[in-house]
Amino acid sequence: MDAKRVRAPSKFAWWFQRQRATAGRAAPRNMSTTRAVWLFVAALTAIRFSLLTTTDLSFDEAHYWMWSERLAPAYFSKGPGIAFAIRASTAVFGANEFGVRFFSPVLAAATSLLLFYFARRLFGATAGLWAVIALNATPIFNIGAVVMTIDALSVFFWVAAMFTFWLAVEKTPSLAWYWPFTGLLIGLGFLCKYTNAFQLISVLAVLALVPRLRREFKRPGVYLLIGMFVLCTIPPILWNAQHAWITLAHLRSRGNLDRGFGFHPAEVLSFLGQHFIVYSPLLFLALVWGVIGSWRRINQQFKILFLMWFGLPVFVFYLLLSVNKSAAPNWDALAFFGFGLVATYFWWERVQMSVLLRISASVAVVVGLIMSVVALDTDVLRVAGYQLPRSDPSDRMRGWKSATQGLEKMRNDLEAQLGEKLFLIADARDRASEISFYLRDKRVEGPGHPPAYIPESQDMVNQFSFWPRYDQFVELKPGMQRPDAEIYTEENGINLFVGRDALFIRAGEKERVPRNVEAAFQSTEPVGTIEVSRYGKVIRIWKVFLCRSYRTLPL
């Protein structure tokens, strides 16, 4: 029994022994490389901060800002992490583009530095430098370093937990606090993006597959880790239990699983193909090559096994899901930090020994940086004399503020003519969120109400379904009179919007409102069109309708 315990770790323990032996000799070089990484990350962070106010918010950012104004234990599709982060930054910098996006470059910098120190501990400072350069040359990471989404928070907690778990297994049992701290980091990541829960599978797989680590199942560390994670899951679980488990239904529909599971090979190819675009073709090719080339060493080197298992669960899950319906390329982004370090280790010594590979690596980084610049601002193509033949992806973050200003002026003019206040209904979550953010006079109808609503529906379609709505009945207090126009009532309830007029805003040029909106008002009529143009091209067009005398629809 004792002999087995001595032999089992020998397959992987050589790495730790070599690190201790070479630590002193490598210190001066590590110091200069570390300084270079800090300067590189600091320069990029300064550039990213300068870009935060150059575009309007994306509709996801605007919607997350609405969450931050209405804090809750969870939301329709995600945990509360993004809402609390935006609430913190806007409390300091205000409800503007800089305030909403403040944490994006901060988290990108922190993730880069964590990745460097982790890679340096595993493979040395030079490998860590290459890992940071490759990461920051990736278009999808650069977008997330400027635009505030759940991914910025998710990847930060993922890399942090991966690093602390390595320290836990490396230093156990002398520093046992790494175990619960890792569980906390996984849990915080889960509160930002539920995909982070896959990290538990990674942890358990590493412990189960390495003989010398199986003894951890007899120690409290791993159970403290799981316990800390479970504590973090309580808020979204309780919220979902009170809201018909809507997040589970939403996630099933996102993967098209509510319609059954089919076999669609083209969807898999689409899923994989998109990665070559958002991760840069040469960098992603190098990653795939490096991971495949390192596969045979998964049972020979502990660090390869460790990193592989921090990529496999997420990637395999979404690869299988794409057999049914193509997943978005950012859904499995967490897998590529473990895979990326494997690929870095595979390539960096080869690159140092080959001039051709050094040139290829430089070209790959330059291509990634160029793609990143274009992804962040397509105007660089126009400056270069190239006109986009199709719709500009950057237009998703343009024209919202101007369009909302036009809408607000139209609302003010109509209110002056009619002598009454109008409430706003947008045709979709995206427009309702952008309008709510960019309205100067938000004028909410009551506590928790959004500045702009979406059309009434008995279905729970998004977070708007759980906020106060214009079709909602409130308690009829003693002495209150029911509106004369109110037809459909609830016992002891009253709808305060009955008889009021609204503006309905829809994208495009359709001359009629949807049937459910038309049925809820006595009359509807178009009152104007809002167009936002850029470089002679219309990038946003809204049709605005005046809807007279609201009446509640029958159930």
Write out the residue ranges for each language-model feature.
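Luminal/periplasmic acceptor-recognition loop/helix of membrane-associated glycosyltransferases
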Residues: 2, 392-555
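Transmembrane-helix signature of polytopic, membrane-embedded enzymes
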Residues: 34-35, 115-137, 155-156
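Signature aromatic-anchored transmembrane alpha helix within multi-pass, membrane-resident enzymes
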Residues: 38, 349-383
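Transmembrane-helix motifs of polytopic, lipid-linked glycan transferases
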Residues: 38, 102-123, 160-164
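Short helix- or helix-capping micro-motifs
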Residues: 41, 131-139, 186, 190
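Membrane-interface transmembrane helices that cradle and orient dolichyl/undecaprenyl
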Residues: 120-126, 161-178
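Short acidic/glycine- and proline-prone juxtamembrane loop motifs at membrane-interface regions
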Residues: 140-154
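Transmembrane-lumen/periplasm boundary regions of multi-pass, lipid-linked membrane glycan transferases
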Residues: 188, 200-325
